[in-house]
Amino acid sequence: MDLSEKMLAQAAKKIQKFGLSNVDIVAQDASAMSFPADSFDCVSAAYVASVVPDPNQFVQEIKRVCRPGGRIVFLNHFKSQNPFLARLEELSNGLWNKMGWNSNLDLWTLMEENDLRIQNVERVNLFGYWKSVLCINEK
């Protein structure tokens, strides 16, 4: 699922390359999905939370389509817990916002505001700058 036709085309190529079946490509907004409530056992959102206009609305929509007790996995950049890096992110966030990216998104605040319990956090990617976050949907 993506809004970008180019990203959907890339997904189609990967589906073909890996011979995947039972995979649908859907063009829609992750903050307003057409799926019924409780449609999925697990929802994975990679590199989305920091580029949507309203991260809270996005998380609420993910919770809506994930069944109670289901897993929600975020792979995203979140504001650093290192005070020096966090300050740099705060100072540069205006520039990043102009490019459509929020460098100052706080993981703990986002999850708390949306009543998501974090089960596990792992640092991933280059220099561990991104995080893989596993939550349980306790709606």
Which stretches of residues belong to each language-model region?
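Class I SAM-dependent methyltransferase SAM/SAH-binding core
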Residues: 1-32
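Short N-terminal helix/helix-N-cap motif within the alpha/beta-hydrolase-1
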Residues: 6, 53-57
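Conserved Rossmann-like nucleotide-binding pocket used by diverse enzymes
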Residues: 26, 44, 73
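A short acidic, Gly/Pro-enriched loop at the edge of an enzyme's catalytic core
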Residues: 28-43
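A short SAM/SAH-binding and catalytic strip from SAM-dependent methyltransferases
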Residues: 41-54
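A short glycine-rich, Lys/Arg-flanked "PGG" loop and its adjoining helix->strand segment in the class I
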Residues: 56-68
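C-terminal alpha-helical "lid/dimerization" subdomain adjacent to the S-adenosyl-L-methionine
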Residues: 73-130
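C-terminal lobe and adjacent flexible extensions of AdoMet/dcAdoMet transferase-like proteins
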Residues: 132-139
